[in-house]
């Protein structure tokens, strides 16, 4: 489906269904549903064969994540507890310089602006290849081991049925994806809260690409602890980017899964 058509359909769906039925521990998790729809509707691989292959790969990936989460729970790095600012990014934004060192094009320029005036720690939400030498020190934040048996109530199932009628996306696939994303969100929420709760001086968290379960979990943990979150956009965002534009039912107090503020690339991105 074309990006513009997917965007318009997501806006229609959000306007038509009850988005308040998706709650976990007091958190409205509709942003997870939106992200699922965005991926499903814009994906070119939608046949059954691809879906089955993807499901098998996801099972192995989930098992690997659980094993790694257990391992890292016993081998946590020592984290400074007097940070005033924390930056959280992704290795995909690393670019090689002439010096052969790697520079994070999203967060490193901001870190340089703050200089020595702030106590800062930078995290990545996945491992950085050993061969890459970075300009600035960093730590890797790992999701916690958390096994949750997730069930859907009748109201949630009803909304998924409505979404299927409007979008033709498989009802079972929607439910499977939601449980998968919610588990990931929970693991990152638990991990982030454990780290952030020890940061008594922390005022702000700068993060990239907020619209995945890892960053949503981090945002929710920060929200619960009263820590401000800022999404630093990784590029210009068009008017059909459904994770930034076209939100119709944002709660009065906002979504805890979303950042408090957005740093946009220019006025057009702000307008969108």
What are the functions of these language-model segments?
Residues 1-272:
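Catalytic-core helical/loop segments in enzymes performing group transfer/polymerization on anionic/lipid-linked
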């Amino acid at each position: 489906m074309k990006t513009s058509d997917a965007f318009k359909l997501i806006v229609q769906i959000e306007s038509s269904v009850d988005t308040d039925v998706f709650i976990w521990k007091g958190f409205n998790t509709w942003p997870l549903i939106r992200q699922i729809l965005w991926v499903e509707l814009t994906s070119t691989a939608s046949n059954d064969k691809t879906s089955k292959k993807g499901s098998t790969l996801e099972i192995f990936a989930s098992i690997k994540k659980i094993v790694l989460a257990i391992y890292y729970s016993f081998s946590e790095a020592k984290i400074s507890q007097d940070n005033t600012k924390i930056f959280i990014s992704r290795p995909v934004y690393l670019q090689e310089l002439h010096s052969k060192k790697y520079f994070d094009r999203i967060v490193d320029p901001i870190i340089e602006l703050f200089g020595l005036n702030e106590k800062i720690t930078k995290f990545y939400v996945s491992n950085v290849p050993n061969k890459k030498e970075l300009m600035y020190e960093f730590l890797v934040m790992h999701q916690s081991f958390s096994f949750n048996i997730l069930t859907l109530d009748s109201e949630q199932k009803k909304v998924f049925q409505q979404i299927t009628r409007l979008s033709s996306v498989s009802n079972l696939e929607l439910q499977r994806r939601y449980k998968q994303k919610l588990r990931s969100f929970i693991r990152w929420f638990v991990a982030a809260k454990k780290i952030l709760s020890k940061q008594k001086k922390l005022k702000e968290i700068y993060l990239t690409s907020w619209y995945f379960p890892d960053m949503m979990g981090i945002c929710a943990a920060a929200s619960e602890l009263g820590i401000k979150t800022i999404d630093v956009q990784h590029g210009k965002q068009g008017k059909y980017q459904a994770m930034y534009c076209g939100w119709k039912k944002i709660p009065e107090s906002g979504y805890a899964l979303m950042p408090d503020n957005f740093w946009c690339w220019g006025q057009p991105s702000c307008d969108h």
